[in-house]
Swiss-Prot record:
<dbReference type="InterPro" id="IPR036937">
    <property type="entry name" value="Adhesion_dom_fimbrial_sf"/>
</dbReference>
<keyword id="KW-0281">Fimbrium</keyword>
<dbReference type="InterPro" id="IPR008966">
    <property type="entry name" value="Adhesion_dom_sf"/>
</dbReference>
<keyword id="KW-0732">Signal</keyword>
<dbReference type="GO" id="GO:0009289">
    <property type="term" value="C:pilus"/>
</dbReference>
<keyword id="KW-1015">Disulfide bond</keyword>
<comment type="function">
    <text>Bordetella pertussis is the causative agent of whooping cough. An essential step in the disease process is the attachment of the bacteria to the ciliated epithelium of the respiratory tract, enabling the organism to resist normal host-clearance mechanisms. It is unclear which bacterial cell surface component are responsible for adherence but the fimbriae of B.pertussis are prime candidates for being involved in this process.</text>
</comment>
<dbReference type="GO" id="GO:0043709">
    <property type="term" value="P:cell adhesion involved in single-species biofilm formation"/>
</dbReference>
<dbReference type="InterPro" id="IPR050263">
    <property type="entry name" value="Bact_Fimbrial_Adh_Pro"/>
</dbReference>
<dbReference type="InterPro" id="IPR039458">
    <property type="entry name" value="FimA-like"/>
</dbReference>
<feature type="disulfide bond">
    <location>
        <begin position="41"/>
        <end position="84"/>
    </location>
</feature>
<feature type="signal peptide">
    <location>
        <begin position="1"/>
        <end position="25"/>
    </location>
</feature>
<protein>
    <recommendedName>
        <fullName>Serotype 3 fimbrial subunit</fullName>
    </recommendedName>
</protein>
<comment type="similarity">
    <text>Belongs to the fimbrial protein family.</text>
</comment>
<dbReference type="Pfam" id="PF16970">
    <property type="entry name" value="FimA"/>
</dbReference>
Length: 204
């Protein structure tokens, strides 16, 4: 099992000309800063190839999603870490933006595709499938607060968790919710649907 250290990326947009910057033939400058931690944990769960976690939501009636923004089928899922430094503080996940991100709703696009875990999870076939109408997937904190996809780690506001010390190191269970959500202004398709999102562990 390999060890992973993930950056917490912060981006700042400079909106006005600044006298300390050289004159450039453009409308502005984007400054990107970040930090790489040498404090690492081992991802214990999911332990599968590429750490793919499959969250199976219950089969529900389309009538459970009558109104825009309605959620149903909320299902908890865990990402477990072990062999973390004992002095490490609270951790959380950052859900990465990507092809499955709906930047308008802050949710994950649902595709009419059956996920085949036994086939080593070929995710490229998911995002190339037909998009489902009227329904997406939502991630949330345990209190139901929407974790908005396609935003920075501060705006995303994923819940943090403290670790448990065992035999001189810490272990963590990072727990969140996944559910169906009614997409605005569309009737809900009845279909087998799938989506996915990458995650990074945010270190203090």
């Amino acid at each position: 099992m390999s060890k992973f250290s993930y950056p917490a990326l912060r981006a700042a947009l400079i909106l006005a000309a600044s006298p300390v910057l050289p004159a450039l033939a453009n409308d502005g400058t984007i400054v990107i800063t970040g930090s790489i931690s040498d404090q690492t944990c081992v991802i214990e769960e999911p332990s599968t190839l590429n750490h793919i976690k499959v969250v199976q939501l219950p089969k529900i009636s389309k009538n459970a999603l009558r109104n825009d923004g309605d959620t149903a089928g909320a299902t908890p899922f865990d990402i477990k870490l072990k062999e973390c430094p004992q002095a490490l503080g609270a951790l959380k996940l950052y859900f990465e933006p990507g092809i499955t991100t709906n930047y308008d709703t802050g949710d994950l696009i649902a595709y009419k595709q059956t996920y085949n875990a036994s086939g080593n999870g070929n995710l490229s076939t998911v995002s190339s499938a037909t998009k489902a109408k009227g329904v997406e997937f939502r991630l949330a904190n345990l209190n139901g607060q929407h974790i908005r996809m396609g935003t920075d780690k501060t705006t995303q506001a994923a819940q943090t968790f403290t670790g448990k010390v065992t035999n001189g190191s810490k272990s963590y269970t990072l727990r969140y919710l996944a559910s169906y959500v009614k997409k605005p202004k569309e009737d809900v398709d009845a279909a087998q649907i799938t989506s996915y999102v990458g995650f990074s562990v945010v270190y203090p």
